Each structure stands twice: as structure tokens, then as C-alpha cells.
Amino acid sequence: MRSDTREEISAALDAYHASLSRVLDLKCDALTTPELLACLQRLEVERRRQGAAEHALINQLAGQACEEELGGTLRTALANRLHITPGEASRRIAEAEDLGERRALTGEPLPAQLTATAAAQREGKIGREHIKEIQAFFKELSAAVDLGIREAAEAQLAELATSRRPDHLHGLATQLMDWLHPDGNFSDQERARKRGITMGKQEFDGMSRISGLLTPELRATIEAVLAKLAAPGACNPDDQTPVVDDTPDADAVRRDTRSQAQRHHDGLLAGLRGLLASGELGQHRGLPVTVVVSTTLKELEAATGKGVTGGGSRVPMSDLIRMASNAHHYLALFDGAKPLALYHTKRLASPAQRIMLYAKDRGCSRPGCDAPAYHSEVHHVTPWTTTHRTDINDLTLACGPDNRLVEKGWKTRKNAKGDTEWLPPAHLDHGQPRINRYHHPEKILCEPDDDEPH
């Protein structure tokens, strides 16, 4: 297979950029409605084809670049360099694996795993949502279905997709699945593969959506817990003294105006709160498993504003004050940017430095990383082998993968404001910020942009 030169690749991308710039400058006032729709259709074809052009680049990166060269995983490198979400980066990698050309161990080119789907995308006949439906089909299809039938099914779905909307394709794929695998996937292995719970991002009001698939065992366990804690009258936050251990009496049941979904929420909260308070979860990264929250003295005194947990969640001050009365949590206070005090409701042999880092950094300090404090390690900005000291002013938080980057050419240092700067090796330096503001959105909105490379 012929390989294009760097000059040819650069020239092709330059020509593509110039052509698109010309299209962006077009004034389409003279076109009729049918002509406008035809133009949009042509643009959609090219939008779809661009996705196919990325597959070879992504697969080559996956095959030749190590984490040291990328500055992390391929998923992280794509997310940070292209300014896309990690989820979108994962989607593109998975699509490239299925639709991009591959190479054998001997170097010989291999066709795409979903050959017909890849060909349809290259021609611009199907888009991202069509591909998603076809990938979902094969994710559910039993491994017992032989290769010939799988290839025929893929070719049929790809052909159907070229003349239908993705939502219409879904119904056809479902029918095809029923014909090929009428009994469904009911094995323990299939159930274990599909299990999972996801918490969505916090919305503006602080609420979070939860979704997922529960195994029969987890469902049975939750049912047993909620039968007690989510019963009418139980764990009612509107009661002055909520009934938790005992059986609610008739008055408690009568006072309870919550919906079943609200009772489930409150019962789950009561169960997890009791588990935290029991102390039976042991330790996590050197601290007893508990809730760590940071806030300012001004907000605490005014009983307004929000605290930030070690997991990166925002907690309204009213909730924070109520939480402090129920369990052994930590509350770190700041006067401006300076740590003021550390309060906790139970004497524990725990590293105070880690708690203050939870409050100060809130998460991994490497730019582009969104790992919260609960998932981060303590990192010595100046290597311990140099100072032989563990000084709070020379510590920061870094997730495991980023912590290991320091051994692969990355350097860290503190600036005059006490922020941690991450300096990449020369081959990874493309002018990215040195300071991570992801965990401190208030600094991005209220302070001048002073974290540019220098």
C-alpha cells in the first residue's frame, strides 16, 4: 500500500481548508427552497465522509503511540488536543476500531470489521447515528451467531441505513435481532457485561440524573432495603425526628405526602448515610471513607452559597449544615485563599494535609483532567528525593495516570500564587495552559486569564 508523504498530506488538508472556507463565504439568497435543501444534503454527505477520514489517523495513533508520547491515554490525548469530551473521544476511537482499516501483525492491511458500514460512511450515505444503531446491534448479538450470518446482517443493515433515518433503522434492527436471536441474552455472563450505574453531571440546580442496568441480585438487594427505609412514613425529612430504625406509626404514615419515587430517594440516602456513619467502609487513599467538603468562612457565616465535595459535587450551604449534624464529615474553611481551619466532628487519626488538598485543589491539578479529589493521589511538586520533606505548600493532587507522567518527561512547579503548573515535554507542548482551572470555574469567570504558557 502506497504511503503519502508529509507534503502531500499537508497539501491535501490545506486544499480541504481552502475549499471549506470558500463554501462558508457563499451567499445563498438566490436559491429556491428545493435548491437550499439539495445544498444541505450535499453538505451532510461531506460531513459524514469527514468522520471516515479520521479513522486511519486514530487507528495509527492507537497502534504506534505509547502513553508517554501522548501524555496519557489516547482517549485523554484526543479530548485535550481536540477540545472534545472524553466520552466523544471514546466514541471516535470505538468507531475507528469498527470502521477503519486495520493492519495484521505482519503489517498487511486488513479490511474494516464492519465492512459494509465503513463503505457507506466513506460514500457519505450514512452518519454517526446510523453507525451507532449498527454498533448497538452487534453489541447485543450473541456470539453464537456464525460469521456468515453476522456479515450478511451487517450488509443488510448498512444498505437499509442509506435510505432511512436512524430512528427508523432502529426498528428494523430490533426486528432483525428478534429473528436471529429470538431467545435473547439471558446468561450470567451477558447480564454481568451489561450491568452498570451512571450518575449524570450536576444540573444548574444541583440535581443529578441517574441511569443504568441492575443485575437481578442488586435489584433484589435494593428491594429489601427500600421495603424498610422507603416505606410510607419512614425516613421522612419533613419529620422533626425521622423514623429510621422503628416501624412508622399511623400518624407518621398520614403525614407522609411524598411520592413513591421520593420515598425511594430518601430511603437510599438514609441507608448510605448509615453506612458512612458506621465506619465499616475502612479507608480510601489514606482517609476514612467520609464526605469532605470545602467552603469559605464568609459563606458559612452567612449560611449561603455552596461547598465543594472531594468528588467535585456542589452542595448548597443548607444541605452542608444539615449533613454536619448527621455524620462524621470533614469541613475545611478558607479565609480568602488561605486555609483557615479544619473542623471535624470525630477525632480520627487521618492525614490533615490530604484534607486541605481536597479543599484547595478539589481534584487533579494537571490541565485538562477532571478527576475529582476522591480519585486523586498526593503528588510532591518538588520530588521528595530532592527535599526529603512533605510540606503542604509543596504538595498537590494528581490522579494516578497523571502522577506517573512526572516520570516520563513532565515537570511540576508552584507559581507565586501557590498554583501548581504542569510543564509538558517539548514534543507535547502546543501552547496549552499550565494550570488546571476545571475544578475552580469561579476563577475562570472572575479572574484574568493568567495561566497561559510562559
Curated annotation (Swiss-Prot):
Pfam name, any one: DUF222
Region described as Disordered: spans on this chain: 415-434
InterPro entries: DUF222, HNH, HNH_nuc
Any GO molecular function: nucleic acid binding
Domain spans labelled HNH: 364-405
Family: Belongs to the Rv1128c/1148c/1588c/1702c/1945/3466 family.
Protein name: Uncharacterized protein MT1995
